[in-house]
A protein has these predicted regions:
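Bacterial N-terminal signal peptides that target proteins for export
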Residues: 1-8
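Short boundary/loop segments of OB/S1/cold-shock single-stranded nucleic-acid-binding domains
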Residues: 20-35
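Short nucleic-acid-contacting surface segments enriched for D/E, G, S/T with interspersed K/R
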Residues: 79-95
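Conserved hydrophobic positions within beta-strands
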Residues: 37-41
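OB-fold/S1-family single-stranded nucleic acid-binding modules
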Residues: 100-124
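Short aromatic-glycine-enriched beta-strand elements
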Residues: 47-58
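Cleavable N-terminal signal peptides
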Residues: 9-10, 20
């Protein structure tokens, strides 16, 4: 019975860790390119595990497309000056991101320039804000 329990726990752990890894995969993002669009905020979702910025952008056919940018969670965004109230529906923004490889409008958020010229970034990860201490030199 003990062997069965340990085997089951091991199997569940392996299966779960694969799902977590896939969730954070960047396989669908073209990290070699950036795209910049200008438009109007349709929705800003401030939350975990990811925040989202939806921007309505005029297209070449006279219509509009909604661009979806996946962002870091609030804990990272605040390190770049973001607040839950930084943007709201109707605000004009210029957004730069790493595009989806399949051509869908959107990607991974890099930065936004607000109407007043303020630039807000993606938010530093903890290791970028507090890098590991370096050994003292004599």
């Amino acid at each position: 019975m003990k062997t069965l329990t340990i085997s089951t726990l091991l199997l569940v752990t392996v299966l779960f860790s694969t799902a977590v890894y896939a969730h954070h995969s960047a396989a669908g993002i073209d990290r070699s390119k950036t795209v910049t669009v200008e438009g109007v905020v349709k929705q800003f979702k401030w939350g975990n595990p990811h925040s989202w910025l939806e921007v309505e952008v005029q297209n070449s056919k006279g219509g509009s497309d909604v661009w979806n940018f996946e962002m870091n969670p609030p804990a990272y965004l605040v390190r770049s000056g973001w607040k839950s109230t930084s943007v709201k529906a109707g605000d004009k923004v210029k957004v730069t991101g790493r595009p989806f490889m399949n051509g869908d409008p959107g990607g991974i958020f890099v930065s936004a320039t607000l109407e007043d010229g303020k630039v807000l970034g993606a938010g530093a990860q903890p290791s970028q804000v507090n890098p590991p201490a370096q050994p003292a030199t004599k």
